[in-house]
Amino acid sequence: MPPPPHIKPENVLKRAQELIAVGQAPAALNVLHEHVTSKRTRSTPIVSLEPVMLLFVELCVDLRKGKAAKDGLYQYKNIAQNTNVGTIEVVLKKFIELAEKKVTEAQAKADEIQSSLESAAPSSNVEDLEAIETPETILLATVSGEQSRDRTDRAVVTPWLKFLWETYRTVLEILKNNARLEVMYQTTALQAFQFCLKYTRKTEFRRLCELLRNHVQNAAKYSAQMHAINLSDPDTLQRHLDTRFQQLNVAVELELWQEAFRSIEDIHTLLSLSKRPAKNVMMANYYEKLARIFLVSENYLFHAAAWNRYYNLLRQSAAALAAGQGTKKENPSVTDADMTKAASFVLLSALSIPVISTSRSRGALVDVDEVRKNKNTRLTNLLGMAQAPSRAVLFRDALNKGLLKRARPEIRDLYNILEVDFHPLSICKKITPILKQIGADPEMEKYVLPLQQVILTRLFQQLSQVYESVELKFIYELAQFPEPFQVTPAMIEKFIMNGCKKGDLAIRVDHISGVLTFDTDIFSSAKALHPGSAAGSAESEAGSVQRLQNTPAEIARLQLTRLAKTLHVTCMYVDPSYSEVRIQAKQAAQARAAAGVAKEHEETLARRVIIDKKKEAATDALQRKQREEETRKRIRTQQLQEAEKQRLLDEQREREKKRIKDEQDRIRQQELKKQLEELKSGVKGIDISELDLEDLDANRLRAIKLAQLEKEKNELNDKIRTTAKRIDHLERAFRREELKHIAEDYEAQKQHDMEVYEATKAETLKEAKEKHAEAVALKHRLSRLVPVYSNFRKEVSEKRHEEFEKRRKAAERDFEAKKKQRIREVQERRRRERAEREAEEQRQKEEEERARREEEERVAREEERRRVLTEEKAKREEERKKLDEIALKQKQREEEAEARRAARKAGVTEPPPRAAEPERTAPRLNIAPRTGGSSWRERQAAKEAAGGAAPAAAPAPEAPKEEAQPPRRTGGGYVPPHLRSGAGASAAPAAPPATEKYVPRHMRDSSSSQPPSRTQTPPAPAAEKPEGSGAPQKWVPRWKQQQS
């Protein structure tokens, strides 16, 4: 079953318009409200729902139904924020425009009612729009019949002002924390600020600021939601900064200084989040408003610091504009007059800072000081300063920047009188004209009172250094200021009491004798006895104010210090070793410091490296955590978006199916109705009342219609056949009757045609004669102009011919000139190209010549290097040969000496043979280095010579085999003693070559794979090495020996 018709937006809109037309606007609003807040509306297309919302907000404004409008707009935002954001902005703008229009109309109506009354601030007596009626106003309205302007505004204008305020608040609540509606949100906030400023709504402005502040605080809480704002985005942050600066401006205009200070804190918080620096024009407005706030709160120290920052910003802007590094849009326009004014205010505000302390009283608690310290830290951060400002620092900064030259003359004179050349007896006379000039300026008049406090403080501090007591009358005469800034005795006494209470002054007043006594007790407060010790005092710096003499308290307090200094100087003069010991101790300390500098530097560098690594690790961990969080957030957001997209697709698909089905049903119903109407009007003979309309469909209707049409066709054919037969008989009768009159008709027609021909012929001849006569007359009339025409034509032709010849000759001259110019250009181009080509060829030749020279030089250097290497190699070979010869001679001398020793031993005693116990042959120690070797041909020849001479050279003694001589070592170097003892029994063998290497035992014993034991007789040397033992042998692996 299809839904009821009033569910469709078009039907709802039509129904509401009908109700409005009959004067039932509340009923129309109820209908629209029910439709907008219905769940079925979520699937309605936005295009068809927008007109309904426009009419809905219009009725809400007319009837002042703010709550209903809020409900409907919330529902509409939820429906349209994912598909079409523009329609939300259109509806909300319409809502605000209608509310503002109603307020304007209400004001006009109130003006008409009370045309004789004028008010600069409408409804100024209504402090709170949400609490309009108070018991006093109700009683006044009851007992008083007078119609005043306030009562008229309260009755006519104030309700619409309240509704407009609720409109702004509702729109801001709807648009909050939505990135797609952020621009509209900021625009609405600016409109709300203008509303508060235009109608002087201070209470609503406070609530608006708190509302915006809560929205920003909740932005981080709802950052995971879809379309949440991101304060890390530079554009978003810049829009919030613009809104907060406008909030600051409105707060200052309304003189709501507390809200202005909170706006300053909001701006500072947003600036700390910003990655890009703020514009200079915005920061100039920031410091200017901050200076006004500090002046109102009588915080003159930070007021002067704000002026100092403002002046620095103006200097930077002027320098940037002069250097062309900035634009006028980003930097405030600065003139010399602006710089002079700013410099004057910087200096004047610094002079107005109280000299004595205003921070605490003498008995203040520590927690109070801590709170004030925290407050000063906050204010310092707001100014963007590294440390808290002070009076001395501000003056030093002003002097370094040359503010005295830029300031106005009276301000410069005031600085010289107060800070440079202060004289208590003539201070008031000197400063009177300056105070008059300052008091004449409305902007500088606010500094007169703090300047009086500074002057009185300096006056009493200077008098306390000179006098012990003075008359009150003398004080009153010194403290004389010009009118209207005159200081009364009561004000002076109040100032003295406040200074004594805070511990800055130590003064007693005796009203009986009229004397003012300065306290000289040496045990009194050090703060009172040391002028200028207060924070921010100009006298805290040495030499800022002339000190006349020390007070008794200072003399008593500094007695030990003076004694220590005197004793130190005396020791230096009396005992020279005292200075030497100090110098030595100083040098020792310096030496220790120098010795530990490197180590401390290395430790510092190591700590810095460790700290950097820890910072990098912490940063990496934080970045990784942030990336993971961003990834999770992105995945979650993507999942939500995909789920929302899928839900919207499903809803869209269902709506489309439903729409198609409804459209098909509607078309089917319309088709049935149309066919029924056609049956009623077109086809006769059908009684529709007998048909069941519920059971009808298109096919049955079509069959009924076709049957009826067939029936009508048959009836029509019968009628046509009967009519044709009747017409045939009539036509035959008509033709028989016509045959009688055909001849007569022919003659009459021919006579008529001849008459028409004669008339046409006569008319044609007449027209031809008239035309011929006119042409002949025209010819005779124009024949007189032919000679004149011919002459004129001839003259024009000759002039044209002469002009043509001139132009042709000029063209030929131009052509020849351009041709010659072109020839010169071509020749010059070819000459230039030829010169460039020759220069290029010359450059290539020079390049090739340079490359060839470089190659030759490289080859020469290579040849020289090879020659030097060859010479060095030859020198090394010669040195090696010399060393080999020296080693060989040394070895020969050692062998000869060994042979001589062996011969001497053999001549003295001959040891018995040791055949039974052969000595163990130890491996040869390769002590003698290999110095020079022979080639493989020489070694081969030596082997062959040794093999042939072995049988002949060996003696043939008859000895048993078991008593064969022990094997001799074939290598040179160290010879064991048992081998030396047997040298006398036989001839000494030839010295082995010095180049023979160490040979292992298992390779020396070639006859057996087992090493010789102690009970076996070692084989003879000839049997061990048949090829001679003089040549070096090559090492052969074990596996290869076994294979052989």
Curated annotation (Swiss-Prot):
The gene is tif32. PANTHER family: EUKARYOTIC TRANSLATION INITIATION FACTOR 3 SUBUNIT A (PTHR14005:SF0), EUKARYOTIC TRANSLATION INITIATION FACTOR 3, THETA SUBUNIT (PTHR14005). RNA-binding component of the eukaryotic translation initiation factor 3 (eIF-3) complex, which is involved in protein synthesis of a specialized repertoire of mRNAs and, together with other initiation factors, stimulates binding of mRNA and methionyl-tRNAi to the 40S ribosome. The eIF-3 complex specifically targets and initiates translation of a subset of mRNAs involved in cell proliferation. Component of the eukaryotic translation initiation factor 3 (eIF-3) complex. Residues 943-956, 1006-1017 have a biased composition (Low complexity). It comes from the Eukaryota. One of its GO terms (biological process) is formation of cytoplasmic translation initiation complex. Residues 92-121, 611-907 form a coiled coil. This is Eukaryotic translation initiation factor 3 subunit A. GO terms for molecular function: mRNA binding; translation initiation factor activity. The keyword Cytoplasm applies. Keywords: Coiled coil, Cytoplasm, Initiation factor, Protein biosynthesis, RNA-binding. Signal peptide: none annotated.
